[in-house]
Amino acid sequence: MKWIKRAEDVTCALLWKEWSTNFPEDRLVILAKERIKNYTRSDWDMMVEEAHALNAYLAKLIVDKVPVTDPKAEHGFELFAEHYIKWFFPIDEEYIHKLALETSINKKYALFFEKQAPGLGMYLPRLIIHYAYKLRPLNA
């Protein structure tokens, strides 16, 4: 399916590029930049391959119209987080809330992903926001 192929080409590394540009002094961004310096070509190839698999999973959720509140979608977010933890930096509750706030206020993330794959631009930010509030509700 051509649409899913396009979605596979949207890698988490692209979101990382946006994040590192917007928050160059963030402690996690600094940590990730240090880790990235040591990656070999093989590491990069593996990271991209894993990101493609992740995006294929997310694309299937969109095609199947799976709501962000569904356990399959929540699993998609967990895969997203695991990818970041493995390749960039640890993701904790504070970071998830920061990412949720950033994606809800700054629409350039949604627009960026939407250009890459129809539906992904709205789905991923909504999924991040849902997961953040699942961890810590507004009134908690």
Give the location of each predicted region:
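Amphipathic alpha-helical "stalk" segments
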Residues: 1-140
